[in-house]
């Protein structure tokens, strides 16, 4: 029995890495950071008062060596519609970026005026990388859901996606008694 087991073991290792080898491609992942100097959301009160509300963020390559990088946005309305566009095409990272409401109205053809922006809408920002071999790596699917595995989504090493909800902040200042 030992001789037969040894023979099978030796023969099975003879072609190790041959036809059973699964090729792995190198990928890339972004790191996106919201700026501390601007809101982490779109302030609908300021927007309704006619202000050109803006957001700032920083983007860098966390992993990999992409040949081309686009900063892309996915805008999901409170009603469930999803709009996708390239916010900044063929950029060099690392870099700081800024987007105003007027910029968003310009790049998303489905959003015509500032009043189209409502509470519950969310702008999600990430990257689309093109690798040297032509492979395109999308972090988001066309419907705005994640196109990457949970280990990329939940890593503590970098943020591959940042989201800016549309919100109405409230001032609940005062004195409260906790019982």
Predicted regions located by residue number:
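C-terminal motif of bacterial Sec signal peptides marking the signal peptidase cleavage site
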Residues: 9-12
């Amino acid at each position: 029995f030992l001789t037969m087991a040894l023979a099978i073991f030796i023969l099975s290792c003879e072609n190790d890495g041959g036809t059973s080898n699964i090729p792995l491609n190198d990928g890339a992942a972004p790191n996106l950071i919201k700026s501390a100097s601007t809101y982490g959301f779109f302030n609908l009160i300021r927007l309704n008062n006619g202000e050109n509300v803006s957001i700032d963020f920083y983007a860098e390559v966390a992993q990999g060596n992409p040949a081309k990088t686009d900063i892309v946005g996915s805008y999901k309305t409170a009603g469930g519609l999803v709009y996708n566009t390239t916010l900044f095409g063929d950029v060099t990272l690392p870099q700081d970026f800024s987007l105003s409401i007027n910029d968003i109205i310009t790049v998303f053809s489905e959003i015509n005026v500032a009043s189209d922006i409502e509470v519950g809408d969310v702008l999600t920002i990430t990257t689309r990388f093109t690798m040297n071999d032509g492979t395109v790596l999308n972090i988001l699917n066309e419907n705005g859901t994640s196109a990457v595995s949970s280990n990329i989504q939940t890593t503590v090493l970098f943020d591959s996606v940042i989201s800016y909800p549309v919100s109405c902040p409230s001032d609940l200042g005062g004195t409260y008694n906790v019982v």
